């Protein structure tokens, strides 16, 4: 009795759909997309789906179903006068209805995690389509009908098909006046355009893994599932990836400045290291920096040569007195010259004064890598810039210190010695009286000697250099002019 009642309900449902009338509570308006509803209690669509799934006979007026539908034909069913659509497939191939389809036919909502797909959406590679793409022209979203079950749902049937997956949709371009699109629900793993492949469970999971988020939230269509996927993608974009390092600002930054000489970071290229070294300012005396050592050098290790001596040492008694009283104030400059031998570059008078005092060591700056050119420049600079202090400056300083009360006995003695040295070096004054007759006699004798020398040069005058000739002629002209002048007196 129950089967007959279901058969009659399916027949009436098919007749009303062919005539374009609103026979069931779940039927869509004219031109709208129609899908069997599992939430609103539309028994007509659900009973029709159960009838097709159980292999019952087709309706007398509008529906024709092939019980021996092969996978190639896809088990299509359509109303009379309606051309077949690409997606209007019927997945039931004589499979008896499961208990889940009866429960959904009675108006019970599908379980959580059910996914919808419209058969009229082509899928070339067998990828499952979301039910949100199957909304009809009428703007009513289709309701999930329990095509595929998520985690915790009822298992698939032995045939690998989802229970109650009946095709209740027509073609979008149907010539019927009803004009309604009935979107059939297709199990995962099936392909459209009339090629029905048995959707295995493994194939469904292999090809539809990317719909896990959408299937877990898919009770009412693709709206809530789309929002969930969008939220997941937004959080994924905002959160840093696993390969990105979370760097705290300020901890990994290297110090800035012109004198930074530390190593650069590990993720920096060789070009940035060279740029940072170029920014470093050169240190003063870069040629000599790090290559000079000040030591107390034995005098016996100095070579007795004067390659860089510019003038003789002269009298070093005063310098020796100052060194004996004050010590050596300034070290000398040397450079290595063989094994345990050194060459003196600057400080010859200081070394002579130390030897005068019978000392055995001298304070010296050893220039480890000093070229001949640099050594010569150093010796010249010391001699040129050692400007002697004039007596006027020394006297002014003595008067200034005496006025300030700072002129001690040692300072006075040093200044007096310096002034005495200047007086001894001054030329003697001309105080001797000269006799003119004696001077004239002396000049006459010298002129006679010069005339004899000129007579000797007359024989070789033509062979002389032009510059020598000009110089002799200039002196003779001066003498001739002087003779004319003296004769006129």
Curated annotation (Swiss-Prot):
Record annotation: effect of changing residue 350 to A: Loss of CTP-binding, located at cell pole, ParA is partially positioned, wild-type affinity for BacP
Protein name according to UniProt: ParBC domain-containing protein
Region ParB/Srx domain, residue ranges: 295-384
Chain segments annotated as coiled-coil in the UniProt record: none
Stretch list, region Disordered: 1-289
Region (Not required for interaction with BacP, BacO or ParA): 1-239
Function: A non-essential component of the chromosome segregation machinery. An adapter protein that recruits monomeric ParA to the bactofilin scaffold. Cooperates with the bactofilin BacNOP complex to correctly position the ParABS chromosome partitioning machinery. May also play a role in bactofilin complex assembly. Upon expression in E.coli associates with DNA and causes nucleoid condensation. CTP-binding stabilizes the dimeric form and allows ParA binding; it is not clear if this protein can hydrolyze CTP.
Domain of life: Bacteria
Binding site for CTP: 311, 322, 327, 329-330, 347-350, 387
Subcellular locations according to the entry: Cytoplasm
Gene: padC
Similarity-based family: Belongs to the ParB family. PadC subfamily.
UniProt organism field: Myxococcus xanthus (strain DK1622)
Compositional bias segments (type: Basic and acidic residues): 62-80, 199-208, 265-288
Disulfide links within the chain: none
InterPro entries: Chromosome_partition/occlusion, ParB/Sulfiredoxin_dom, ParB/Sulfiredoxin_sf
Quaternary context: Homodimer. Interacts with BacO and BacP. In situ probably interacts with monomeric and dimeric ParA, in vitro interacts with ParA in the presence of ATP, and with ParA in E.coli.
PANTHER family recorded: CHROMOSOME-PARTITIONING PROTEIN PARB-RELATED
UniProt GO cellular component terms: chromosome; cytoplasm
Cytoplasm in keyword set: yes
Organism phylogeny: Bacteria, Pseudomonadati, Myxococcota, Myxococcia, Myxococcales
Phenotypic effect of disruption: Mislocalization of ParA and of ParB, nucleoids are more compact, bactofilin patches are mislocalized. Synthetically lethal with smc or double scpAB deletions.
